[in-house]
Amino acid sequence: MTTQLEQAWELAKQRFAAVGIDVEEALRQLDRLPVSMHCWQGDDVAGFENPEGSLTGGIQSTGNYPGKARNATELRADLEQALRLIPGPKRLNLHAIYLESDTPVARDQIKPEHFKNWVEWAKANRLGLDFNPTCFSHPLSADGFTLSHPDAKIRQFWIDHCKASRRVSAYFGEQLGTPSVMNIWIPDGMKDITVDRLAPRQRLLEALDEVISEKFDPAHHIDAVESKLFGIGAESYTVGSNEFYMGYATSRQTALCLDAGHFHPTEVISDKISAAMLYVPRLLLHVSRPVRWDSDHVVLLDDETQAIASEIVRHNLFDRVHIGLDFFDASINRVAAWVIGTRNMKKALLRALLEPTDQLRQLEASGDYTARLALLEEQKSLPWQAVWEMYCQRHDTPAGSQWLDSVRAYEKEILSKRS
C-alpha cells in the first residue's frame, strides 16, 4: 500500500466519521452485494448454438470491434480477464444459447449436462450462475411470437424450452450453493395496430403457468419475468407489458425483472423499486443505459445508476434485490465494456453505502427539505474515491484507470489474433 493511498484512506475515514458513517462497515456491506455480469457482452449475443446466425427479437448489437469470443473457451478466458479487474463478489448470467455440445441440441431438449463446463468453471472462479431461456434468434420465433404464439405446437416448443431452462437453473443452484435467478423475457409483439390485444396475453398467462408448474427448491432456483415497452419490429404492441408482468409476478409471487431500458425514455426503474417491493417477493434488476431507446449502452456512473443503488441501500433490500447488468456494445473492447460497467455499478453501491441516510431521513421527516437538499449535494463531494481505492487494494485489483493497461495487453496478446 502506498503512503499516498494510506493517507487518503485515513482522511476519508475521518471525513465520513464526521457525518456518522463507518467506512469499514460500508465495505463489509459492499462485499455482500454481488453483481451478475452478463456473458453476452463478450460475443454480441451470438451464443454457440448458431454463432453465424442473425440476432433477432427486436434487439441490436451495433459495432464491429475486433476480437469477439468465438467459442466457450475464448469467452471464459475473456471473462476471467474482466473478473480480475473488478473488485468484490460477482456472478455470471448465462443465456441458453451458450450451451456446449458436440452435436446440435434443440432448445426444448437442453439439459444440465450441456452446461457442466460452465458449472465447473464457476466453481473454480467462486461465482454463482444465473440463467435465461433464449426465446429469440430461432426459426420458431421468426414471426415475432413465442410463448404467446397462436400455433399450439410452436407455443408448446417454447413452453418446453422454458421448462428445460428451469431445470438447468435449478442445477446451477444445487451445484453452486447459491440460487440461480432465471429470467424469462420474450420478444412477442406486433409492428402495427393490433386488434386483439387480449388473446395473446391470455395465451402467455396460461403458458407461463405451465412453465412454472414444476416446483424447485427456492434455495436453488428463483423465477423472474421481464416486461418491455417495445422492440424493433414490435413498436405497436408488446404482449409482455409492464402491467402484464407486474400482475403476473404479484399473483404468482415470482420475482419481477426491471430493465433500465425497457420503459419509456422518461421513466426510470429507480422509482419503480419501492413500489414493486410492496407486492412481489424479489426484484431482479437489469442495469443498462438506454440512449433514446433500449440501446443497451455500457453502464455509466450516472444519476440513474446511482439512484438504483441508493434505493437498494436506503431500504435495506440486500436480500430481496438481485443486481444484474444487461448491455452489449460491439463498438469498443468487449472486456473493457464489462469492466467499465461492472465497476461503475459497484461504485454506485459504495457511494450509496457511504450516504448518511439516517440523518437525511430525519430531516425529511421533520420537513427540513432545505437541509435535506444541502446535505445530499454536499455528500457528493466527500472523498468516496479514496474508499473505493482501498476496496480495490484489498481485493487485489487496480484502483484507478491502471486496469486499462491490462486490457490493452490482453488485446494485443490475445484478442488481436482472433479473425
Swiss-Prot record:
Alphabetized Gene3D superfamilies for the sequence: Divalent-metal-dependent TIM barrel enzymes
Enzyme class of the recorded protein, top EC level: isomerase
Subcellular location: Cytoplasm
Cofactor binding summary note: Binds 1 Mn(2+) ion per subunit.
Reaction(s) this enzyme catalyzes, per UniProt: L-rhamnopyranose = L-rhamnulose
Listed EC numbers: 5.3.1.14
Keywords: Cytoplasm, Isomerase, Manganese, Metal-binding, Rhamnose metabolism
GO annotation (BP), single: rhamnose catabolic process
Family annotation (InterPro entries): L-rhamnose_isomerase, Rhamnose_isomerase, Xyl_isomerase-like_sf
Coarse class of the protein's main subcellular location: cytoplasm
Cofactor requirements of the protein: Mn(2+)
Pfam families found in the cross-reference section: RhaA
Molecular-function annotations in GO: L-rhamnose isomerase activity; manganese ion binding
Pathway: Carbohydrate degradation; L-rhamnose degradation; glycerone phosphate from L-rhamnose: step 1/3
A GO-annotated cellular component: cytoplasm
Residues annotated as binding Mn(2+): H262, D294, D296
Subunit structure as annotated in this protein's UniProt entry: Homotetramer.
Similarity remark: Belongs to the rhamnose isomerase family.
Task performed by this protein: Catalyzes the interconversion of L-rhamnose and L-rhamnulose.
Protein name: L-rhamnose isomerase
Gene behind this protein: rhaA
